[in-house]
C-alpha cells in the first residue's frame, strides 16, 4: 500500500476542472505509462481516476481509456481525500489548478461537496497582471518565489477563504484539512487559520500529492486494479524517484 513512483508534468490541458486539450491529456498519460514501464518492466493496464464535484466523471474516464487503460475506480476528489484521512466532523479544501473542491465529512462519510471555479490558474492570472508578464511566465515564476509573490496573490486566497466560509457555515465541523498544490504557497495555512480561529487547520507537508495519493489508495482498496494514478491531468514537472 506504499507509493512507489510518481509522474508529474507541467502542461496546460485542464482549465477550471475541465479537460480542454483532450489530445494533450492523453499524450501525457501515455508518456507517463511509458516511463513507468521502463522503471518497473511491465505495462500497467488499470487506473483509478477522480473528478471535481459537479463535473462529468466521463471526462477523466475518456482520457484514461483513450490512453489504453481500463478504469477500475472513479470517485470525486474530496471524497478520496476524506477516505484516505479517515476524517470525522471535518472539512476538506482541495485547491487545485483550476478549481477549489470543498467537502464536509461526518463519521467517515461525505455529507456535502461543492466545487468552485477558482484555483492556481487564477493565482497565475493575478500574478501576470501584477508583474505585467505572460501567463506562462507567471506560472513559472510563482513556483520558485512564493514568499515574494504573497502580497500580490494574497487577495485571491482571501477570496478563496471567503468562499470556503460560505460552504462550511453551520456544518459543525472541528477540523479543516487543506490539500492541493496551490495550498503549498507560503502564507496560505496561516491565512486559513486566521479566517477560521475556531477550527484546527491542517496542511500536510506534501499537500501537492494528497489528492493523487488518495485516488491511488481508493483504487487499491476497490481491488482488481494493477496501476492506480491520478489521471486528472494537472500542471506539474515530471519527477520519478
Language-model features, listed with the residues they occupy:
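Short beta-strand scaffold segments in enzyme catalytic cores
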Residues: 1, 100-104
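Nucleotide/phosphate-binding catalytic cleft detector across ATP-hydrolyzing
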Residues: 1-92, 109-241
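A generic beta-sheet turn/junction motif
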Residues: 95-97
